Amino acid sequence: MEAPAQLLFLLLLWLPDTTGEIVLTQSPATLSLSPGERATLSCRASQSVSSYLAWYQQKPGQAPRLLIYDASNRATGIPARFSGSGSGTDFTLTISSLEPEDFAVYYCQQRSNWP
């Protein structure tokens, strides 16, 4: 009667390794720049997300605004100074010349494996 319990325990031990959880790490945590300068933000995934990565901008008291989807496509109405690149595990958001309204919080988000 102990064998099934032991087997179940072993299977449960392995479950965390099969969930496919993807961790995204952004860098740098903060940037000190001035208007007119170039900003480069990085996002690294713990495993490949192909090109299924989006970038968002959020300002205080506002909902996040989609900037880039599928790694390199600008969302509707997003200025050309915003560009995205990368695939697999390494991605970059570049703001070619910062405008005063660009000073905000930026997030990356993957959509390769929704729960």
Curated annotation (Swiss-Prot):
Pfam families according to UniProt: V-set (PF07686)
Chain's role: V region of the variable domain of immunoglobulin light chains that participates in the antigen recognition. Immunoglobulins, also known as antibodies, are membrane-bound or secreted glycoproteins produced by B lymphocytes. In the recognition phase of humoral immunity, the membrane-bound immunoglobulins serve as receptors which, upon binding of a specific antigen, trigger the clonal expansion and differentiation of B lymphocytes into immunoglobulins-secreting plasma cells.
Region (Complementarity-determining-1): 44-54
Signal sequence extent: 1-20
Gene field: IGKV3-11
Source domain of life: Eukaryota
Record region (Complementarity-determining-2): 70-76
Cell compartments where the protein resides: Secreted; Cell membrane
Subunit details: Immunoglobulins are composed of two identical heavy chains and two identical light chains; disulfide-linked.
Protein name: Immunoglobulin kappa variable 3-11
Domain Ig-like: 21-115
Keywords: Adaptive immunity, Cell membrane, Disulfide bond, Immunity, Immunoglobulin, Immunoglobulin domain, Membrane, Secreted, Signal
InterPro entries: Ig-like_dom, Ig-like_dom_sf, Ig-like_fold, Ig_sub, Ig_V-set, IgV_Light_Chain
Single GO MF annotation: antigen binding
Organism per entry: Homo sapiens (Human)
GO BP terms: adaptive immune response; immune response
Keyword Disulfide bond annotated: yes
